[in-house]
Amino acid sequence: ARILSAFREGGADAWFAADHQALLGSDYDLADYEPVTDILDVWFDSGSTHAFVIEARYGEGVRADLYLEGSDQHRGWFQSSLLESSGTRGRAPYDAVLTHGFALDKNGRKMSKSVGNVVDPLKIMDQSGADILRLWVASTDYFEDVRIGDEVLKGTSDSYRKLRNTFRYMLGALDGFSDAEKVAVADMPELERYILAKLGELDVELRSAVDALQFHRYARALTEFANEDLSAFFFDIRKDCLYCDGEDSERRRAYRTVLDLLFH
């Protein structure tokens, strides 16, 4: 209790500042001992988070699905966690480890305050919005070091705008749509059935990308589908049908049925 009390009041530094005889207690003579002030491992505390965070919150024996950090943590947090958990639990504290590269400036240089090339995420959100930053993160191949700067973010903003315009178009084209208007897939024209087949392929690719933690594949597949298969192809072919065919036209109803499936 005396040791616990000392560390509760003084933190880890209590070992260096405390009266060591008081820590030993009256049953031991300090002259028989030599206090050691060497650092065991700077990552020792963080390596024990599996016991004091995960198990404390979710129960003994529970381990993390994923540990996520930069490549430098193979000799840091990943390693200390593995060693401590293997020694005390007989197993790794995680099911998988995901390592990402580092964010560099637009010229591929390491960011440094002294150089003045640090890109502040808060400024990006203030200038462009959080969704632009999220899309940039999702679009980057984190297996390598990634660059970020005004030109890179401009490209991300363009991709975001195209995605948003795709959804805005569908939202407008679906005005007044109801279940009574729906057409069975078997009764749809070949073009609509083709787009639904492409949607099925997209679903398989997106799920595969997420399972593999390759989120850049997810973002690329989604944007390519929206830009090429929908905007430049499907929407362009069917725009006359949407605006010129009668409301009861089966082709128009089939088109809007597919739009409803795509949107939702």
Task: State each model region's role.
Residues 1-176, 195-238, 242-243, 257-264:
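Structured secondary-structure scaffolds
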Residues 182-183:
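Generic long, charged, amphipathic alpha-helical segments
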Residues 187-194:
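The feature captures the catalytic groove of carbohydrate-active enzymes
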